[in-house]
Amino acid sequence: MNEKSRKIYVSDVTLRDGMHAIRHQYSLADVGRIARALDQAGVDSIEVAHGDGLRGSSFNYGFGAHTDLEWIAAVAEVVEQAKIATLLLPGIGTIHDLKAAYDAGARVVRVATHCTEADISRQHIEYARSLGMDTVGFLMMSHMTTPENLAVEARKMESYGATCIYVVDSGGAMNMNDIRDRFRALKEALDPATQTGIHAHHNLSLGVANSIVAVEEGCDRVDASLAGMGAGAGNAPLEVFIAAAERLGWNHGTDLYALMDAADDIVRPLQDRPVRVDRETLALGYAGVYSSFLRHSEVAADRYGLKAVDILVELGRRKMVGGQEDMIVDVALDLLRNPA
């Protein structure tokens, strides 16, 4: 089946990854308004949670304005067609949190691990399947391992019961060849019935291009967000990806103009820091740093009189991964002690 004949599954992440862009401070009214617009525009799923997934609200990652369940319930009140999705990182969220999210209305879960740690997802994937959820394996920081090793990890998630596996460019560090190689490796390793997905970040301005290449390589699901609302320079902007898909003649099933209106009229005004490629977010992609480190690094830079870029580049040199936000202050203090 070619790209024009098959339907692309459009997975919106404005209300989960987009949390990072405003330090997890969406109001319930904001969440409801955005979800209603997305639902009316025809997206397939709407992911809802703290930026770091279920139970992510904490000192380490940042406290949310509301609980995950309050946000999910607010979305459940307004959506009529789209499925509600959520994110779970083993070690942060538990199966008890997943059951509560399911009871609140979530029917899709993406179980996320570092790209070489799929083995820690087994319990959560198996439990999600027992609930009857659409269960996705989400391999974060996929640039940090080879395509062949990524395929090995993907097969583990598949063996636990995941019916879709994502290549996740958490650092926005990959180019089109990197994406192509990883999807080819996954397609060769996985059962043909297992779907694949792409989660791109825009730190090198390649979020849309990488998503297009993924679809060309047989990718079934595409993550994107209104106005690119997400960590770092954001995700692939949903309205831009859909416009490009429309020009390519692809079947996406969404209303482009409704998405454009929602991006500019609803989402962009909420940004307290522009979601864009700039000096700091470009450093994320260039150094291969976890995108949600951005706001934490800027806080540390202000506190200690440093440049955020220097902190981010050093984090990349040390190959820090998601979950190591506490190391940002350590890096800042090291830079203070040992200035270049």
Swiss-Prot record:
Keywords: Aromatic hydrocarbons catabolism, Lyase, Manganese, Metal-binding. It is an enzyme of class 4 (lyase). Residues 8-260 form the Pyruvate carboxyltransferase domain. GO terms for biological process: catabolic process; L-leucine biosynthetic process. The active site is at 20 (proton acceptor). The keyword Metal-binding applies. One of its GO terms (molecular function) is manganese ion binding. The record marks 16 as: Transition state stabilizer. Substrate binds at residues 16-17, 170, 199, 290. It catalyses: (S)-4-hydroxy-2-oxopentanoate = acetaldehyde + pyruvate. Belongs to the 4-hydroxy-2-oxovalerate aldolase family. This is 4-hydroxy-2-oxovalerate aldolase 1.
